[in-house]
Structures are given as C-alpha cells and as structure tokens.
C-alpha cells in the first residue's frame, strides 16, 4: 500500500483568531512589501515567532520541523500529521499542508507543494539549521536563499494597538501571579510550591479573559537565597528561610505573547547590607523608567544607568542589559535582539515599541548583601514618553514580606 507524503486535514471549524483579520492583513502587507522591494518570491519561515506572528499558529515542535510559506498571494502553514487538524484550525492564511512520517523528508515535499518554484527565497538565518538549509537548497537548485529574519524582527519591534492591548492583559495577569507568590510565601515553603501557586493563578486568569485560548507555556521562576544569582535559574526544592533574598518572576504566555513581572523580595526581614544593594538597584530602576521615551538611544540609556552603578561601586556586578522588547517571544523563541537596552545596541526608541526596564546586580556568596537583585516593569513607548503598565509594587517599603 502506498502511503501519502502529504495530506489536508480539515477537521472541525476554524477557531477565532487572536487578533482581527485586519491586523493579520496589515502584517502580511508589510511583509509582502519587503519581499517585493528585495525581489524575493517567497518567505519560508521556520521559527516559532514568525510563524505565530504571521499566521496565529504556535507549533509544538517535539523534534519535528514546521514552516510558513508566504508569497504575494498565499499564506500556507506546513505542519506534521501528529497535530491533526489543529494547525489548519488556527492558521490565518490560505491553506495548511500536513506532511506525514511515512517517508523521510516529507516536510520538504510539503514546502515544494506550497512553493513549486522560486528564484529568490527568504529564510531565517538565525533559526534554520544547516542541515535543513542544505535540504531546502537542494529542492530549489536554481534559487538564491537570502535572510529575512532581521527585517521581520524590525517589523515586529513596532507593536500595533491590538498588540498593546494583548500586552496590557499580560501585564495584568503577571501582577496576579505576583500576588499569588506573596500569598503562598512563608517560612520553610519550597520554591516549587510557591511557583505552582502563581502559575495556576495566571493560567486561570488567562482562561477567564480569553475565549477558546490555547493555554500553554505560562510559567513561574521563584528563586530563593543563592538561587537568585541567575535571572533564569530553575525552580528547585530549596525551602525559603526568614531573611532570605527572594526573586519573583511571573511569565504569562498568551497566544505566544510574552509578558513578565520580576521583583526582589525578602521574607520577614532584610539585613542592612542587603538593603543597601537593593536600594541602589531600585535607584537605577527608577532612573531608567524616566529614560524610556521616544528619541532615546538604547546604548545611551545603558551608559547613563551605568554611571549610577559606578557611583555605588556596583557596575562590576551588573549581569545583563537593562531591558528588552516584548511581543511574540518566550524563553525558547523570538528574542527581538535589535531592541535591547545595551551598550552595543544603537536602536532609537519609537512610539509603539514596548520595552522593559529591569536592572540586575548579583553579588556572589561570601560578600555582604550576597544575592541577585532585579526589578522589572513593562513600558509602552508613546508620542509623549512611556506608559508603565506594571502595577505590582517594588522596593523595600513594600516587598519585605512579614507573616
């Protein structure tokens, strides 16, 4: 029996898209204008973020590749048979082609069905691995493969009004997660119990806000003591002690859109040495909030904030840049690296951009005030300055939690 290489699975009805039809039409139009200007026949996206951004389909890879083929006429998602009809139900576009596991490299067969011929194909240099790039090139021996990832990132950096609304919801849900952390916090509670409580609260809040939403990827990092030394350190079984430095990190994920709340906390009391470090980091945070406005250069913001840390002899303990862009991204996809508050980024802030202000310093064990300190707010840049959409309190006056 000859089994098929590809399928169409039209199972059920199309679901309500995350954004309006006009929103996706605007995204497609901007992309197509870029393709036309660069004489690119089609874009073959492979990343979570661009496939989600242009089609509203956020795939679950599990080791399989996915794609979105965009031409001047079509938007076609390429998905694996294991997903059934879900990719078709979600895709905002003209078609969905399913590839099967019956033969090797049916993925590329599906791409060729979506794009029979092309002279110039846009790919994502920062995502498509070398093996699959070579296989794609072999399917189109006369085509030139060129990068579109950087240009698409620049398009994503300016958020629409609908995206702003989504990010506002995310910031609100993150604040709910933060409140749940404080609620669960007590002496000798394990980190994972606090994190579980916060994640459950956020997932429920997302479900209450959005109809027919896919609930995936929302998470919490709650770190205590030495575990605060890395911003992305995993949750552990460590138990919280009175006087511990604590790091609250809540990340609601809504339709692939990321938001975050991050705060330094202490349980019961805070030593004088810790308080000095904390207050210095808060000083930088507050200064940074005032610098987020149109016309400011990312590198200039970083340099100005460096001076405050220098004043406190703490610059050597800074661990990363002062903030980054938001949008369709997560801890495993979508970093908009062109919009980060770092010394090596000269991007100028514009209305519509969404950035965080999140200074962090880390003093190693054995030093007075040891631990990692971080405050994180989200700001929407507008014509007159920026709107801070994070409402959860920060600093020693509010976040020494006494129970």
From Swiss-Prot:
EC annotation from Swiss-Prot or TrEMBL: 3.5.3.3
Regions that span the bilayer: none
One MF term in the entry's GO annotations: creatinase activity
Positions annotated as active site in the UniProt record: 232
Reactions listed under catalytic activity: creatine + H2O = sarcosine + urea
Summary of subunit composition and partner proteins: Homodimer.
Family: Belongs to the peptidase M24 family. Creatinase subfamily.
Protein name (database record): Creatinase
Source species: Flavobacterium sp. (strain U-188)
């Amino acid at each position: 029996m000859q089994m098929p290489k590809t399928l169409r699975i039209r199972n059920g009805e199309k679901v309500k898209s995350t954004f309006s039809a006009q929103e996706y039409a605007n995204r497609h139009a901007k992309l197509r204008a870029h393709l036309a200007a660069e004489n690119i026949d089609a874009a073959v996206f492979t990343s979570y973020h661009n496939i989600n951004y242009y089609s509203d389909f956020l795939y679950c890879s599990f080791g399989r590749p996915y794609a979105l083929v965009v031409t001047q006429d079509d938007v076609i998602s390429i998905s694996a048979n294991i997903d059934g009809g879900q990719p078709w139900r979600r895709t905002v576009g003209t078609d969905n082609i399913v590839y099967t596991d019956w033969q090797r490299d049916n993925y590329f067969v599906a791409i060729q069905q979506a794009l029979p011929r092309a002279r110039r194909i846009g790919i994502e240099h920062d995502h498509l691995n070398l093996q699959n790039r070579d296989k794609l090139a072999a399917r189109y021996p006369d085509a030139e493969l060129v990068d579109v990832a950087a240009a698409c990132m620049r398009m994503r950096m300016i958020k629409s009004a609908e995206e702003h609304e989504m990010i506002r919801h995310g910031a609100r849900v993150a604040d709910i997660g933060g409140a749940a952390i404080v609620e669960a916090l007590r002496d000798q509670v394990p980190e994972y119990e606090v994190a579980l409580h916060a994640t459950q609260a956020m997932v429920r809040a997302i479900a209450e806000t959005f109809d027919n939403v896919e609930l995936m990827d929302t998470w919490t990092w709650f770190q205590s003591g030495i575990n605060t030394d890395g911003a992305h350190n995993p949750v552990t079984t460590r138990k919280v002690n009175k006087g511990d430095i604590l790091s609250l990190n809540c990340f609601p994920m809504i339709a692939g859109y990321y938001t975050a709340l991050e705060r330094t906390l202490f349980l019961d009391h805070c030593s004088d040495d810790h308080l000095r470090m904390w207050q210095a980091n808060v000083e930088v945070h507050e200064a940074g909030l005032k610098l987020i406005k149109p016309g400011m250069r990312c590198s200039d913001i970083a340099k100005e904030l460096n001076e405050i840390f220098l004043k406190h002899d703490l610059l050597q303990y800074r661990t990363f840049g002062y903030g980054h862009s938001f949008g369709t991204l997560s801890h495993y996809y979508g970093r908009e690296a062109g919009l980060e508050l770092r010394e090596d980024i000269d991007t100028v802030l514009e209305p519509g951009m969404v950035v965080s202000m999140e200074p962090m310093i880390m003093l190693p064990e054995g030093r007075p005030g040891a631990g990692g300190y971080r405050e994180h707010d989200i700001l929407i840049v507008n014509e007159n300055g920026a709107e801070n959409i994070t409402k959860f309190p920060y600093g020693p006056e509010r976040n020494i939690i006494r129970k």
